[in-house]
């Protein structure tokens, strides 16, 4: 297991259970006590957890792990969702994407569509995610519109009054919205961070 994967697994445990003990890390991840301590120290240095005697607890000021740690979680499912979503996109379409790991994968799959080869008929992509805008801006067949706003460090999304001012003047044909959860009524949840 790579260092990144260990850190992601430890963050998952802490987010799900509220805390983790070094013995749990040793047992669950099959690492030495020294490796478990180093991993917790690294995550504490990044302010993702708060160290305790023999373990760590969730950082009370951080309710959402950074995007780089959420990317590998359920990667196969995200790829399947992304491929299905990208199949709905055609040259000339106007689409919207918010930030998140799944919508980042959707953007990557859109960029790989064989039908998007004519720069004269680009897809217009509206996003509030600077990481998605960065990846897509170099694509000749994608025109990128960024909403503006204040950057959220953990998700790379632009939010706030500036984004709220521009959104009413933008129209998209298809919106791919990444959320944290969905209930049986279709209501969604999203981190506020």
Task: Map each language-model feature to its residues.
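HTH-adjacent hinge/linker in prokaryotic transcriptional regulators
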Residues: 2-7, 15-23, 27-30, 34-101, ...
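Conserved phosphate- and dinucleotide-binding cores of soluble alpha/beta proteins
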Residues: 2-25, 29-34, 44-45, 77, ...
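Short, active-site-adjacent cap segments at secondary-structure transitions
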Residues: 57-58, 102-105, 132-133, 182-184
